Amino acid sequence: MSGHGTPIPMTSRRASPLKGEAHVPGDKSISHRSLILGAMAVGETKISGLLEGEDVLDTAKAMQAFGAEVVNHGGGEWSVFGVGVGGFAEPENVIDCGNSGTGVRLIMGAMATSPITATFTGDASLNKRPMARVTDPLALFGAQSVGREGGRLPMTIVGAAEPVPVRYEVPVPSAQVKSAVLLAGLNAPGKTVVIEREATRDHSERMLAGFGAEITVEDTKEGRVITLTGQPELKPQVIAVPRDPSSAAFPVCAALITPGSDVLVPGIGLNPTRAGLFYTLQDMGADLTFENPRTEGGEPVADLRAKYSPDMKGIEVPPERAASMIDEYPVLSVVASFATGTTMMAGVKELRVKESDRIDAMAKGLRANGVTVEEGEDWWSVEGCGPEGVKGGGTAESFLDHRIAMSFMVMGMGAQNPVSVDDGSPIATSFPIFERLMGDLGASIIRTDG
């Protein structure tokens, strides 16, 4: 059930301490990329631990529409039989990417340098999000696009019949834009160069290299320079998807604010471009440790242990950390509510164009639950109420955003009074087992729809 279905109101209340192991789903970023790169390789790519949320399943359907064979063997085990770089067929129908900004932007890139036409749409939330940030660089390859006003979905992309390689400096830190350009560069002759002034998550670069693409990454004075040689033959891979750090954030943060809690979250991907939240929590004084660090599939992995942390202090989050934790600011702001002192989060303008305007959405919901929040265009601050000091008792609007809904469910686990959201249905897009997993740890989340 996602943002285009019947609303599911939910309420979370303080229950017992949270105890046990939380096995969160596979990483969303790596799941999308595994399916897309598998479809562009020649032969069978085997994937285990795939996140089977709605967003990723929409990407799997899209790869089938472009001619790849995608097989679900059950238990998170999947196969993709790829058609090779430049081998995409023209889809017969509109590609519906649901709630997934990652899915639609990466797929647009992957097809933009093939001589085919495809039309993309999404749910009410996705159809409000800006796509020009992707279609502008794709136009440099020779692709054409026609969409609604402001570069929004539904949108038709006419791929370039004779693509040219591109040198592109990404104007705002965005792994989605960078990845779309790199995927487009796969089917352009010559070298495509992407320059990032601020490093973002690097799963695409790591995975492209793993699939056999010729790609180099160099840190220079002008930023991170990524060079990709076009028209390789990608070789199929066996991929074990690490567990998603953005999903791990919820049981971790819930344990920190719920008295008596001790939770282990095993097998979490700790790619340095994704782990900013955990370092920030440690800076605040959280009892959070990394156990059994190891490398799996080229990605750093560890088990996270989080315990109730009544001594957390508000801090100024370094703005340069923003790209490595952009999806985690909503739940960080909940933890900040239970700290002592003020937490300042700056350099976060990107939050205003996520699934919702996340600064606005969190500020409204926090205030409804007795927390003082200030905000500017690219910053916001949360005044901590101290451990067990958050009143709660309010209802937050989720704005069709899975992370907003889950963040307020976490808040209810530590607040004095129950916390509600108007619609928890979007949670299924990234974390379909959220309610069950948190309930197994001892949380009380109930659906209140009659």
UniProtKB/Swiss-Prot annotation:
> What is the predominant subcellular site recorded for this chain?
cytoplasm
- Keyword entries, A-Z: Amino-acid biosynthesis, Aromatic amino acid biosynthesis, Cytoplasm, Transferase
What subunit structure does UniProt give? Monomer.
Q: What is this protein called?
A: 3-phosphoshikimate 1-carboxyvinyltransferase
Any one GO biological process: aromatic amino acid family biosynthetic process
Compartments reported by the entry: Cytoplasm
Q: Which residues form the active site?
A: 327
Membrane-spanning residues where? none
User: Upper lineage ranks?
Assistant: Bacteria, Pseudomonadati, Pseudomonadota, Alphaproteobacteria, Rhodobacterales
